[in-house]
A protein has these predicted regions:
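Alpha-helical transmembrane segments of integral membrane proteins
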Residues: 2, 15-20, 39-41, 254-396
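Transmembrane alpha-helical segments of multi-pass membrane transport proteins and ion-pumping complexes
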Residues: 1-5, 23-27, 49-61, 85-93, ...
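Long, internal scaffold/assembly segments composed of regular secondary structure
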Residues: 176-269
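Hydrophobic cores of alpha-helical transmembrane segments in multi-pass inner/ER membrane proteins
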Residues: 19-30, 79-94, 141-154, 206-224, ...
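Cytoplasm-facing juxtamembrane segments at the starts of transmembrane helices
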Residues: 36-48, 95-117, 131-142, 160-178, ...
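N-terminal signal-anchor module of multipass membrane proteins
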Residues: 1-63, 69-74, 78-91, 97, ...
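Membrane-interface interhelical loops and short amphipathic "cap" helices
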Residues: 3-11, 59-72, 123-136, 187-202
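Short, intrinsically disordered terminal tails adjacent to the first/last structured region
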Residues: 390-411
Length: 411
């Protein structure tokens, strides 16, 4: 998740960018602890982590990088990170028994609670962690805090107290530590060593991802995580490709056009309900949507931000790349390792290309962050392949990697 979060901050911000670490951490945990409903868990994790991406925190970081407002910035980042982790944990827990009525009820509960918190705390800015004097941002953290509490309560009422409470509480702790201390790394670095032109923001993201991933892995190891069973085959490759394209387009369109401060949360809840009804759609929500966001981000930077070429061909290429990616998602359905490597390396290659097309020149690919992305992805691939080779040498081992062989997850 450390790699996923670092990528999220570079190749796709907002909720769609946050789906990258969500999908990657779910795939990693399902690889370490094999189960049959991998794509369903990955969909709930991708959307659950993605929801927190609707929170604004750029101006909160603006506080932590100044000595006189450091502690207010620290409090704001720690609180927002904790809420991010708690809500994501609760949504993931809902994915362990994704009955349609349960998911529909959970989506409604989250929406109502978010609206209450937004309307009575965030909109009037009663407690505010952004800059009131300079383009004040519409915060949503209180709405998501109430959403997390309401969803845990709802899942407890539905008989899922243990995983919901444990994932939410541990996510709250890991997210709070990760974002609070991660922000401190950036703040203290820029306050005391302003002459060093380092990627302080990226170091913050890596640390946040590490702590968030650790929290989710601990919760996974110490919670009841029932397997909801086989996802089932789709209606045929051609129809599934069309359906995958439709749900991908719908999630983007609803998120961009719904007149709400938490449009992605509303759209994500609707899509998760679709997943609970048509479980074969889960892989496209978890992986195809995530990659499409990455591809569209690169097209935007190529055409608008870096002005390397016209927008039309760039966005057309992004759509074609997403279709090809979706086809491989169908082809490798059921192979957790291949799917994880597909998503991970597609994102890393996209990041390398984005470094290369920067106006300052292709020399950017030797940036230590770019090199770090490649090395971390290579390390993940090497560890998975080393485990397969080691397992094949044991006469009684199964083809699926075991958690015992891998040790406790380091995500």
């Amino acid at each position: 998740m450390m790699l996923g979060w670092g990528l999220r901050g570079f190749i796709g911000g907002g909720p769609f960018g946050a789906m990258i670490p969500g999908a990657m951490v779910a795939l990693t945990l399902c690889y370490l602890y094999p189960r049959r409903d991998v794509s369903v868990i990955a969909a709930f994790a991708a959307v659950g982590v993605g929801i927190g991406g609707e929170m604004t925190y750029g101006q909160t970081i603006g506080f932590i990088v100044k000595a006189d407002t450091f502690w207010w910035g620290f409090l704001g980042l720690a609180l927002k990170g904790a809420i991010w982790g708690a809500l994501a944990g609760a949504v993931i827990a809902m994915g362990f028994r994704p009955r349609p009525l349960l998911v529909l009820g959970g989506a409604v509960v989250m929406a109502v609670a978010t609206q209450i918190g937004w309307k009575f705390i965030n909109e009037p800015k009663l407690i505010y962690f952004s800059n009131l004097l300079d383009r004040p941002r519409p915060e949503i953290w209180a709405g998501f805090l109430l959403a997390a509490l309401a969803l845990v309560g709802y899942l407890a009422w539905q008989g899922q107290l243990q995983p919901a409470l444990r994932f939410a509480v541990v996510g709250f702790i890991g997210g709070g530590i990760g974002f609070g201390l991660g922000g401190s790394i950036q703040g203290l670095g820029r306050i005391f060593t302003p002459e060093l032109k380092l990627h302080w923001w990226k170091y913050m993201e890596f640390f946040f991802g590490y702590c968030f991933g650790w929290a989710l892995s601990w919760a996974w190891q110490h919670s009841e995580t029932p397997d909801s069973g086989e996802v089932g085959a789709g209606p045929g490759d051609a129809i599934e490709m069309l359906a995958g394209a439709a749900v991908t387009a719908a999630l983007f369109w609803l998120s961009w056009n719904t007149q709400s401060r938490f449009a992605y949360s509303l759209a994500g809840g609707a899509v998760l309900y679709v997943v609970s009804r048509c479980r074969w759609m889960a892989k496209h929500v978890a992986y195809t949507v995530t990659f499409t966001g990455v591809a569209l981000d690169l097209a935007k930077y190529w055409s608008k931000e870096y002005q390397r070429g016209p927008a039309g061909p760039a966005y057309a290429a992004a759509v074609v790349a997403s279709v090809i990616f979706g086809w491989y998602v169908i082809r490798w359905n059921g192979d957790t390792r291949k799917t994880l490597e597909l998503l991970m390396w597609a994102c890393v290659v996209d990041a390398v290309v984005k470094f290369a097309i920067h106006p300052s020149g292709i020399v950017n690919v030797v940036d230590h962050v770019c090199i770090g992305f490649v090395l971390m992805a290579a390390a993940v691939s090497w560890m998975m392949r080393a485990e397969i080779i080691a397992g094949s040498c044991e006469p009684s081992s199964s083809s699926a990697p075991s958690a015992a062989a891998m040790g406790s997850p380091s995500i």
